[in-house]
Curated annotation (Swiss-Prot):
It is found in: Cell inner membrane. The keyword Cell inner membrane applies. The chain crosses the membrane at residues 3-23, 66-86, 144-164, 177-197, 213-233. The lineage of its organism: Bacteria, Bacillati, Actinomycetota, Actinomycetes, Mycobacteriales. Coiled coil: none annotated. Induction: Positively regulated by LysG. The gene is lysE. Catalyzes the efflux of L-lysine. Can also export L-arginine and L-citrulline. The lysEG system prevents bacteriostasis due to elevated L-lysine or L-arginine concentrations that arise during growth in the presence of peptides or in mutants possessing a deregulated biosynthesis pathway. In vitro, can also export D-lysine during biotechnological production of D-amino acids. This is Lysine exporter LysE. Transport process is modulated by three forces: the membrane potential, the chemical potential of lysine, and the proton gradient. Strongly inhibited by CCCP and valinomycin. It comes from Corynebacterium glutamicum (strain ATCC 13032 / DSM 20300 / JCM 1318 / BCRC 11384 / CCUG 27702 / LMG 3730 / NBRC 12168 / NCIMB 10025 / NRRL B-2784 / 534). One of its GO terms (molecular function) is amino acid transmembrane transporter activity. PANTHER family: ARGININE EXPORTER PROTEIN ARGO, ARGININE EXPORTER PROTEIN ARGO-RELATED. Residues 1-2, 87-143, 198-212 are cytoplasmic.
Length: 233
């Protein structure tokens, strides 16, 4: 149980920093749009990354130690780029805050042709079908963005191999899997908490002023994480 708790705490410490995934989860929670798809991508990705990190850390560090350095510097570049984008958004006069998706009843024009009760009903049905199709597709873009921000983020591999795999390796063959399970438990708690919490607070969090400050915090945290990675070398 102690190993599990240690993994849980390490996983939580990695998640507490405002990273690209967290920002996306918050934004989609505020929009109430594609949140479940984003959460599933984040959680399923963590399963594969933690398994890869637990299995591959010894092989990678012994066979190709330079790969860890490449991932570290790639993570630094990625974090600095994300920090610059957040700072740019914070400094612009018009900050684009996520908008809440309101559900509205489709309307039919008043000039419906005579005898148009059936026509109006048919029109409403067609509009409802179109709205339903749009709602079905609305999760695709956030899901693809979650995949990109997870799997093209060098820092994700660094966390999986160096922190989850590297620290977990000291607990032996069985203990490292318990450690990884604890780290995943942190993800299982964190992502839904952040996403649904953002949805519950969507109205105050939709303010451009609030998002200007969020972008400032994101820029500072991303820069601090990049500096921390530099010092690890």
């Amino acid at each position: 149980m102690e190993i599990f708790i240690t993994g849980l705490l390490l996983g939580a410490s990695l998640l507490l920093s405002i990273g690209p995934q967290n920002v996306l989860v918050i934004k989609q929670g505020i929009k109430r749009e594609g949140l479940i798809a984003v959460l599933l991508v984040c959680l399923i990705s963590d399963v594969f990354l933690f398994i890869a990190g637990t299995l591959g850390v010894d092989l990678l560090s012994n066979a190709a130690p330079i790969v860890l350095d490449i991932m570290r510097w790639g993570g630094i570049a990625y974090l600095l780029w994300f920090a610059v984008m957040a700072a740019k958004d914070a400094m612009t006069n018009k900050v684009e805050a996520p908008q809440i998706i309101e559900e509205t009843e489709p309307t039919v024009p008043d000039d419906t042709p005579l005898g148009g009760s059936a026509v109006a009903t048919d029109t409403r049905n067609r509009v409802r079908v179109e709205v339903s199709v749009d709602k079905q597709r609305v999760w695709v873009k956030p899901m693809l963005m979650a995949i990109v921000l997870t799997w093209l983020n060098p820092n994700a591999y660094l966390d999986a191999f160096v922190f989850i795999g590297g620290v977990g390796a000291q607990y032996g063959d069985t203990g490292r899997w318990i450690f990884a399970a604890g780290a995943f438990a942190a993800s299982l708690i964190w992502f839904p908490l952040v996403g649904f919490g953002a949805a519950a607070l969507s109205r105050p969090l939709s303010s451009p002023k609030v998002w200007r400050w969020i972008n400032v915090v994101v820029a500072v945290v991303m820069t601090a994480l990049a500096i921390k990675l530099m010092l690890m070398g």
